[in-house]
Amino acid sequence: MAIKERVGIVVSNKMDKTVVVAVESRSPHPKYGKIVVKTKKFKAHDEENQCQEGDKVRIQETRPLSKTKRWQVINIMSHSS
């Protein structure tokens, strides 16, 4: 089975070694066809505490690390200005 990867924006880094990443998905409405943007938040493991709010990051699914944390940060694609 393929390992899931997502790209999103860091919305919170207040926890130790954990960031909250908001991932947007765009899909057409089943009846009306308009593109609907849905946002889902994932808690991801950030071992070195490098991520800042607003950074664009790539996260990868991993084994459960805590009650709600099942993703880890692979790399920081761009830093916030």
Curated annotation (Swiss-Prot):
One of the primary rRNA binding proteins, it binds specifically to the 5'-end of 16S ribosomal RNA. Keywords: Ribonucleoprotein, Ribosomal protein, RNA-binding, rRNA-binding. Belongs to the universal ribosomal protein uS17 family. NCBIfam families: PRK05610.1, uS17_bact. GO terms for biological process: translation. GO terms for molecular function: rRNA binding; structural constituent of ribosome. Part of the 30S ribosomal subunit. This is Small ribosomal subunit protein uS17. One of its GO terms (cellular component) is cytosolic small ribosomal subunit. It comes from Synechocystis sp. (strain ATCC 27184 / PCC 6803 / Kazusa).
